[in-house]
């Protein structure tokens, strides 16, 4: 089902529509077939204008079995189209999900426009000339459904046929069987009387600035951003990682790009992965480790070591439902406080969070900039919704990318009282407080590293209380001094020049649902302001002033209010927290109601 959704998404992107997707699948490799927990779904929202979310209520549902129908029916609005694979609506599959009678016959679907289609039978019939077994032929029924949907929405088909022939190049008969099933689905829509209406969704020409676009997922955009950061820094990119859902795609993608100086190491565990990455940073590479929440917990000691060593290191956390193993394939934003404080001692780390799948590219570059300029580990907090979701991305010109080149230490930087010139590994840049980056093997720059406290300047081991106090405060000051842009606020004023009294402040992947909800509220005649944080540590310098402008501040989060807690503590603002931890992103309609109630309260 994920492949089917991905192909329809690619068709839609190539046609020029704006879009947003929500893949949703169980954690098991082979989930129990026909059960509610085993349902794999793919939701796509596309239009001829800009799109912000995968949509609250799908207008078309393709239910391949009773479980798929029951799991998704509550989200489908009255009057929507439901295409049902009638071959699967037999007694046993229906009983498995609690249907005592067939929903196709008991009147429970009267509010919908139901299209009963024997997808399995039609697929087997279309492939009878290939000599496949029934089981082999049945596997192509998703392609039949894809062909039918492609006909309904006048999607281009050449890309899908080319994809299928490439994917099954070593099994040409399977490739042609899938192409045939795909074409059969299209032809069925063209010839059957049950589908009297098809839809034309024009390209979203006004939604996109001029440029070259491609469809991209968050993890792919993040991978490309890391590669670009390595090239812009003129450094080898090193990834030390251990596979974990939903971050593993980054390891898979980066392993394909050795031609760009990328080296990947699949370690035996999370600790080895970050340890190797930190070693690569010491050796002069742009070092990255990728993980999710449980892996962050295991990496915490080495992150603290990176803080002490003051070396550039990117920790990419693709957040998922927790605690512990939790919900590996579902989304959440509950690692914010872990990223802020999840280490022993005072160990501050800058935090950057992308807001959309495409924005993951820019966020990776920004995280790399901070790490390289300030010689510090940096957290990049994405989540499962961004990682697996996709949208159109304008491919940037290389000239648009920031220059991330750094200067390695090359010789002595301190003169002692007797006139001797020596190298001090902790002699800091006066502006950034970053220490010099000395690559091992550079003559005369040998120095100690390790987790024990260092003496300011010399880098020698030090147990001196005053020195420890100074080093702790200096490391904090370095992070506090990271240069981040001021927070921009979208606050349309009325005719008298008066702004809104209510501000909605979000971070990370809540951007799409919040923005869609704010637009709904404004269309209803209400005034409301919106701002979105990319930098969570340090906060933008004007954040306190922005918060003080408004009577009410609403903070929607997919956790139990972690950002709101930070805002209350730092700015003494009465932030109203609106939370959800269902493993799914917010719906714009629900947020719009929350915002209206807050405005009118």
Q: Which stretches of residues belong to each language-model region?
A:
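Thiamine diphosphate
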Residues: 1-16, 27-34, 159-162, 166-349, ...
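Flexible loop/turn segments at secondary-structure boundaries
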Residues: 28-31, 70-71, 90-91, 246-250, ...
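Conserved thiamine diphosphate
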Residues: 55, 109-112, 116-122, 330-377, ...
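Flexible, low-complexity linker and terminal segments
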Residues: 208, 215-225, 233, 363, ...
């Amino acid at each position: 089902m994920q492949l089917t959704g991905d192909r329809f998404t690619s068709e839609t992107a190539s046609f020029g529509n704006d879009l947003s997707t929500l893949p949703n699948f169980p954690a098991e490799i082979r989930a129990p077939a026909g059960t509610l927990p085993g349902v794999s779904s793919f939701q796509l929202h596309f239009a001829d204008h800009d799109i912000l979310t995968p949509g609250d209520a799908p207008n078309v549902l393709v239910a391949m079995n009773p479980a798929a129908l029951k799991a998704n029916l509550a989200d489908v609005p009255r009057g929507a189209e439901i295409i049902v694979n009638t071959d699967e609506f037999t007694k046993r599959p229906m009983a498995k999900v609690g249907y005592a009678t067939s929903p196709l016959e008991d009147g429970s679907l009267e509010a919908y426009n139901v299209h009963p289609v024997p997808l399995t039978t039609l697929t087997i019939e279309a492939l009878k000339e290939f000599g496949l077994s029934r089981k082999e032929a049945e596997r192509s029924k998703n392609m039949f459904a894809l062909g039918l949907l492609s006909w309904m929405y006048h999607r281009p088909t050449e890309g899908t046929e080319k994809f299928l022939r490439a994917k099954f190049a070593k099994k040409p008969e399977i490739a042609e069987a899938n192409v045939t099933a795909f074409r059969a689905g299209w032809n069925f829509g063209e010839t059957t009387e049950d589908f009297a209406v098809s839809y034309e969704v024009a390209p979203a020409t006004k939604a996109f600035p001029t440029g070259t676009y491609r469809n991209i997922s968050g993890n792919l955009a993040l991978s490309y951003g890391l590669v670009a950061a390595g090239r812009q820094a003129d450094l080898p990119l090193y990834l030390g990682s251990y596979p974990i859902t939903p971050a593993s795609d980054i390891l898979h993608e980066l392993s394909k790009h050795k031609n760009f100086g990328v080296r990947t190491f699949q370690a035996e565990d999370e600790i080895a992965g970050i340890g190797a990455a930190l070693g690569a940073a010491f050796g002069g590479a742009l070092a990255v480790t990728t993980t999710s929440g449980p892996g962050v917990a295991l990496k915490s000691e080495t992150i603290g070591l990176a803080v002490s060593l003051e070396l550039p290191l990117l920790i990419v956390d693709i957040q998922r439902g927790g605690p512990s193993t939790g919900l590996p394939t579902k989304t959440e934003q509950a690692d914010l406080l872990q990223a802020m404080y999840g280490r022993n001692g005072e160990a501050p780390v800058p935090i950057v969070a992308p807001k959309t799948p495409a924005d993951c590219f820019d966020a990776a570059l920004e995280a790399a900039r901070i790490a390289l300029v300030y010689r510090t580990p940096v957290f990049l907090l994405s989540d499962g919704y961004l990682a697996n979701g996709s949208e159109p991305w304008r491919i940037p010109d290389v000239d648009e990318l920031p220059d991330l080149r750094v200067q390695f230490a090359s010789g002595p930087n301190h003169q002692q009282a007797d006139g001797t010139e020596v190298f001090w590994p902790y002699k800091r840049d006066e502006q950034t407080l970053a220490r010099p980056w000395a690559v091992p093997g550079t003559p005369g720059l040998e120095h100690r590293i390790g987790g024990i406290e260092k003496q300011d300047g010399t880098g020698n081991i030090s147990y001196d209380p005053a020195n420890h106090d100074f080093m702790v405060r200096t490391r904090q000051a370095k992070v506090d001094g990271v240069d981040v842009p001021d927070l921009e606020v979208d606050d349309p004023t009325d005719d008298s020049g008066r702004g809104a009294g209510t501000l909605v402040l979000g971070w990370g992947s809540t951007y799409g649902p919040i923005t869609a909800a704010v637009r709904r509220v404004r269309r209803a005649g209400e005034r409301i302001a919106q701002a979105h944080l990319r930098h969570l540590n340090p906060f933008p310098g004007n954040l306190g002033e922005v918060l003080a402008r408004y009577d009410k501040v609403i903070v929607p989060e997919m956790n139990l209010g972690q950002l709101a807690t930070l805002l209350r503590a730092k700015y003494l603002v009465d932030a109203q927290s609106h939370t959800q931890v269902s493993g799914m992103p917010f719906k714009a309609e629900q947020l719009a109601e929350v915002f209206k109630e807050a405005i009118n309260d």
